[in-house]
């Protein structure tokens, strides 16, 4: 009897997944820990590797099938992995006919060895995977490798392009990924369940910009990470949550659950959709630790390597639409949380300061909150506290 290929544990509260792509077919030789397939959950894409050497026996669940944790999806005939292409066996050569030397060629990268998200990125940008250096396991190409290739300078074209391609179809129908369906459902559930209201304020970024500019080089030299603005906002948010505990609470049936810990979700946009990895116990971190943690989570998100643990929980979220140029927005709450802070683009605007007209770098901030648990006064006070701390960043450093 063959060795079963089963759906691994997917993390807390996750019981189902979808088979995104098999990389092996029945009869293929495999080695221990070699990639067999990818499965897609509501939040992440996970790799399933071979538990032993052998050949693929039977594939029970094909691409696109919904599967449960622990379910058998195929099996492996255990034994030494053998080459599947018998034509590659060496043939004897006669002594009178010397074999001409051939220049070794770089093996072509087959499309079926690319992860679905990587293949989509390669296809959309008309890239040749053979020209992309893979840094993943066994030299596989990751999304990070594709993005690095896209950002690299390209040499000038040396030949004319081929004849124009036929006009593209005006409509393309693509099946929604499990992640996209989950995002759609959760956002709609949020609007249907919570009494969402949004309040706004604006921040003069002059002092925090000056502080960052003065110490960013010294900070990076000492801590090995760049000093961004997100660490200031995370620290300011935590102080505001301590001042207004209801924003860090949630509704559970007939109870209000007040959380005395601060796990801050930071929204990250990826090719597959929006994910919100969590910075655990952010109140116990300094600026450098916050920047390192956010940077690491963002890289894992872009490379599709977030784990379920990275995405689970969270007591409050921050979304920075400003990195895309957003001037103002009304972010949607990530349930069961009761609030989300929206950051936006900093731009110079004319403002009145002590009766004088001045030009200052200003940012609009927004708090979307569940009005069932948070009163308007509390929501406004929450943003006022953040405004106060960002406009006087020395208070964050002195814990004032």
Swiss-Prot record:
Q: Which GO terms describe its cellular component?
A: cytosol; oxoglutarate dehydrogenase complex
Give residue numbers for the modification (N6-lipoyllysine): 43
Supply the CDD domains for this chain. Answer: lipoyl_domain (cd06849)
Pathway(s) it belongs to: Amino-acid degradation; L-lysine degradation via saccharopine pathway; glutaryl-CoA from L-lysine: step 6/6
Q: Which keywords, in A-to-Z order, does the entry hold?
A: Acyltransferase, Lipoyl, Transferase, Tricarboxylic acid cycle
Biological processes annotated in GO: L-lysine catabolic process to acetyl-CoA via saccharopine; tricarboxylic acid cycle
Kindly give the InterPro entries that the UniProt entry links to this protein.
2-oxoA_DH_lipoyl-BS, 2-oxoacid_dehydrogenase, 2-oxoacid_DH_actylTfrase, Biotin_lipoyl, CAT-like_dom_sf, E3-bd_dom_sf, PSBD, Single_hybrid_motif
Q: Which cysteines are joined by disulfide bonds?
A: none
- For the keyword Transmembrane, the answer is no
Its required cofactor(s), as named, are: (R)-lipoate
The gene coding this protein = sucB
GO molecular function annotations of the record:
dihydrolipoyllysine-residue succinyltransferase activity
Q: Which Gene3D superfamilies does the record match to this protein?
A: 2.40.50.100, Chloramphenicol acetyltransferase-like domain, E3-binding domain
Source taxonomy lineage?
Answer: Bacteria, Pseudomonadati, Pseudomonadota, Alphaproteobacteria, Rickettsiales
Provide the E.C. number(s) assigned to this enzyme: 2.3.1.61
**Bias-annotated ranges (Polar residues):** 85-97
Q: What catalytic activity does the UniProt entry give for this protein?
A: N(6)-[(R)-dihydrolipoyl]-L-lysyl-[protein] + succinyl-CoA = N(6)-[(R)-S(8)-succinyldihydrolipoyl]-L-lysyl-[protein] + CoA
Q: What subunit structure does UniProt give?
A: Forms a 24-polypeptide structural core with octahedral symmetry. Part of the 2-oxoglutarate dehydrogenase (OGDH) complex composed of E1 (2-oxoglutarate dehydrogenase), E2 (dihydrolipoamide succinyltransferase) and E3 (dihydrolipoamide dehydrogenase); the complex contains multiple copies of the three enzymatic components (E1, E2 and E3).
**Could you identify this protein by its name?**
Dihydrolipoyllysine-residue succinyltransferase component of 2-oxoglutarate dehydrogenase complex
Query: Residue ranges of the Lipoyl-binding domain?
Result: 2-77
Active-site positions on this chain? 371, 375
Tell me the function of this protein. Answer: E2 component of the 2-oxoglutarate dehydrogenase (OGDH) complex which catalyzes the second step in the conversion of 2-oxoglutarate to succinyl-CoA and CO(2).
User: What does the cofactor field's note say?
Assistant: Binds 1 lipoyl cofactor covalently.
Domain Peripheral subunit-binding (PSBD), by residue range, is 113-150
Q: Which family does it belong to?
A: Belongs to the 2-oxoacid dehydrogenase family.
Q: Which SUPFAM superfamilies match?
A: CoA-dependent acyltransferases, Peripheral subunit-binding domain of 2-oxo acid dehydrogenase complex, Single hybrid motif
Asked whether the UniProt record includes Ligase among its keywords, one would answer: no
Q: Which Pfam families match?
A: 2-oxoacid_dh, Biotin_lipoyl, E3_binding
């Amino acid at each position: 009897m063959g060795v079963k290929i089963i759906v691994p544990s997917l993390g807390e509260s996750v019981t189902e997944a979808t088979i995104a792509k098999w990389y092996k077919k029945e009869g293929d030789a495999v080695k221990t820990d070699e990639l067999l397939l990818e499965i897609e959950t509501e939040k992440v894409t996970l790799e399933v590797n071979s538990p032993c050497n052998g050949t693929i026996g039977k594939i029970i669940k094909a691409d696109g099938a919904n599967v449960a944790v622990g379910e058998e999806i195929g099996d492996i005939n255990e034994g030494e992995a053998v080459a599947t292409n018998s034509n590659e066996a060496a043939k004897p050569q006669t002594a009178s006919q010397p074999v001409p030397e051939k220049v070794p060629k770089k093996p072509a990268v087959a499309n079926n060895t690319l992860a679905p998200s990587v293949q989509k990125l390669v296809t959309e940008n008309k890239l040749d995977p053979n020209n992309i250096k893979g840094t993943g396991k066994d030299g596989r190409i990751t999304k990070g490798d594709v993005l690095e290739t896209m950002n690299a300078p390209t040499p000038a074209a040396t030949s004319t392009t081929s004849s124009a391609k036929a006009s593209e179809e005006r409509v393309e129908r693509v099946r929604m990924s499990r992640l996209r369906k989950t995002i759609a459902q959760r956002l709609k559930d949020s609007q249907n369940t919570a009494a969402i209201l949004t309040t706004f304020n604006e921040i003069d970024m002059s002092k925090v910009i000056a502080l960052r500019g003065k110490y960013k080089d010294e900070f990076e030299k000492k801590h090995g990470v760049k000093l961004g603005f997100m660490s200031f906002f995370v620290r300011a948010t935590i102080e505001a949550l301590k001042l207004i505990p209801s924003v860090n609470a949630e509704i559970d049936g007939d109870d209000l659950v007040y959380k005395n810990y601060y796990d801050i979700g930071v929204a990250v946009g990826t090719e597959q959709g929006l994910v919100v990895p969590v910075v655990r116990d952010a109140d116990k971190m300094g600026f450098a630790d916050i920047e390192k943690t956010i940077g690491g989570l963002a890289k894992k998100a872009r490379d599709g390597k977030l784990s379920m643990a990275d995405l689970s929980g969270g007591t409050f979220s921050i979304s920075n639409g400003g990195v895309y140029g957003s001037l103002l927005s009304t972010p949607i709450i990530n349930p069961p949380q009761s609030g989300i802070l929206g950051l936006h683009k900093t731009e110079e605007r004319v403002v009145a300061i002590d009766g004088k007209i001045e030009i200052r770098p200003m940012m609009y901030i927004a708090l979307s909150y569940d009005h069932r648990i948070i009163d308007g006064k509390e929501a406004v006070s929450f943003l006022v506290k953040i405004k106060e701390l960002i406009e006087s960043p020395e208070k964050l450093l002195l814990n004032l």
